Design a protein with these regions (language model features):
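Acidic catalytic loop of the alpha/beta-hydrolase fold
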Residues: 37-41
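Catalytic histidine neighborhood in serine/cysteine hydrolases
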Residues: 53-72
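N-terminal Rossmann-fold cofactor-binding loop
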Residues: 12, 34-36
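Primarily recognizes the serine-hydrolase "nucleophile elbow" in alpha/beta-hydrolase
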Residues: 1-27
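A short helix->loop->beta-strand "cap" motif at the edges of active sites that frequently abuts
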Residues: 5, 28-29, 55-58
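Short alpha-helix in the alpha/beta-hydrolase fold that links the catalytic acid
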Residues: 42-52
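C-terminal and inter-domain tail/linker signature
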Residues: 36, 69-72, 76-220
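Short beta-strand/loop motif that positions the catalytic acidic residue
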Residues: 26, 31-34, 64
Length: 221
């Protein structure tokens, strides 16, 4: 981190507490990920590191509760997927702040929703996604994994299956480095059966408002 690079990310940080006299040579943004139960970096060592960098706003230090050494390594017994994913998001945020690219994730998500609910164009909707997308509507466990399965779902059960007056009322939107969490109210008149939301329920003709939370992850460049 003191070799004139733009940004550095550190996992586990074994032995860092023994070389803290070199910290002034670190001039780039730095993110450190520690495991709470790591015997190689006990709490005392982590506290020394945190104390040494407490006046550095460009240094972020995270400890992941209940995790052990190598929590970020798939295939290891200590692998912890939730912690690894969170660490990945924080690392990506640091890299993008320093190096880019800088995407407008909110705009990308709006474009996706526009083609889902306004133009109702399956091909245009699919074009906003990665080559191997994944969608899961948790309450009914509907969606698709992979391009072909998801396109089939969108074509026969989603994009062309929503009532004509369907609309989204935004409530709150949280934007991270690699995801958007969108809270909204999904509004429609129940004029047709909606497979992905109310499967098996014949149209009632009633106006319906359903609160929804969409967690949208972004991959690639």
């Amino acid at each position: 981190a003191h070799c004139e690079i733009d940004v550095a990310v550190c996992y586990y940080g074994v032995g860092i507490e023994e070389d803290l006299e070199l910290r002034e040579r670190i001039t780039c943004p730095l993110v450190m990920h520690f495991a709470e139960l790591d015997q190689f970096v006990p709490e005392e060592a982590r506290q020394k590191v945190s104390k040494a960098f407490e006046q550095r706003p460009d240094v972020e230090i995270y400890t992941y509760p209940g995790t052990d050494h190598a929590f970020n390594t798939p295939g290891r017994d200590s692998y912890d997927k939730p912690a690894a994913q969170m660490a990945h998001s924080r690392s990506i945020a640091a890299f993008r702040r320093a190096l880019g690219p800088h995407h407008n994730l909110s705009e990308l998500w709006d474009t996706h929703c526009y083609h889902e609910f306004v133009t109702r164009d399956v091909n245009a909707t699919m074009a906003t996604m990665v080559s191997e997308p994944y969608v899961n509507h948790i309450p009914t466990m509907t969606g698709g994994v992979g391009y072909d399965h998801l396109k089939r779902f969108y074509t026969h059960h989603f994009v062309n299956n929503n009532p004509d007056d369907t609309k989204l009322i935004p409530v709150s939107r949280t934007i991270g480095s690699d995801r958007v969490v969108d809270e909204m109210v999904f509004c429609f008149t129940h004029t047709r059966e909606i497979d992905w939301m109310l499967p098996g329920i014949e149209p009632t003709g009633k106006y319906v408002e359903v609160p929804l939370v969409a967690i949208v992850c972004f991959r690639g460049d």
